[in-house]
């Protein structure tokens, strides 16, 4: 009987765990859907800013100031700034493992070359995995808030901008998981700075038309009066709605800020969507495994009960025959 009690207790415990994993699966699915919507809404803006920045390198109409040149040129003999985006919580499968392993491999390669390294880590899991071995490389650590927070993006951007402006780093690379679907996340290593030259000939051939779509004609020019324009930056016609805040003289500086902001925002959104997708898949697998385990335990319980009943019947029959 004690064996039956243990089986019932275990079944009850597994069912309780199954309810938790199922709830976590549904919560992650809801969060993932919301973040996917945010990604869809921001994709065009992020791509447009990136291509505008890259196109500046291909045209001669803009004379970059000394401060602006720091964001477009590699500074020799300075540190490599690695930004690592991981999760704040666990229970998300191999989401963090692929990022951490890639970072460790790259750090080892940079160490072999004798290069300097700086780390900015976002997310508790990445910090815990890297702090013991690379504590001397860690420049900053940020905890990941429960919801997408612009303050985090601004803090990370400020760290990057400060490091570049003070000539502390030669380049900036960001590591994050790119969302493909709930079951697939792609480990991505993307260079933010220096800004890479854009290779699309259509953009280079007619840069003024594309930049006019964003409200400027050339350095020093005033913003155009109309509030919407058609841009061909991403290869298709789309209406862009915008507000004017800056004179053309500050165009490059403000574009640099927009560019760094957009890259960090893109990586954060992709990482969050990937995390929730990985957690949803992990919890779905856990729920299914719990269901299989419950079925096996119930079968074992029924067999044990049947064995006890059979034994008792045999004893009763044997006793009656003896009488």
Curated annotation (Swiss-Prot):
Cell compartment(s), UniProt: Cell inner membrane
Topology of this chain in the membrane: Peripheral membrane protein
Keyword annotations of the record: ATP synthesis, Cell inner membrane, Cell membrane, CF(1), Hydrogen ion transport, Ion transport, Membrane, Transport
Chief location of this protein within or outside the cell: membrane
One matching Pfam family: ATP-synt
GO CC terms: plasma membrane; proton-transporting ATP synthase complex
Lyase keyword on record: no
Biological-process GO terms, alphabetical: proton motive force-driven plasma membrane ATP synthesis
InterPro entries for the chain: ATP_synth_F1_ATPase_gsu (IPR035968), ATP_synth_F1_gsu (IPR000131), RPE2 (IPR022436)
GO molecular function: ATP binding; proton-transporting ATP synthase activity, rotational mechanism
HAMAP family with a match to the protein in the record: ATP_synth_gamma_bact
Function: Produces ATP from ADP in the presence of a proton gradient across the membrane. The gamma chain is believed to be important in regulating ATPase activity and the flow of protons through the CF(0) complex.
Record-stated family: Belongs to the ATPase gamma chain family.
Quaternary organization: F-type ATPases have 2 components, CF(1) - the catalytic core - and CF(0) - the membrane proton channel. CF(1) has five subunits: alpha(3), beta(3), gamma(1), delta(1), epsilon(1). CF(0) has three main subunits: a, b and c.
NCBIfam families for this protein: ATPsyn_F1gamma, RPE2
Name of the molecule in the record: ATP synthase gamma chain
Organism this protein belongs to: Rickettsia rickettsii (strain Sheila Smith)
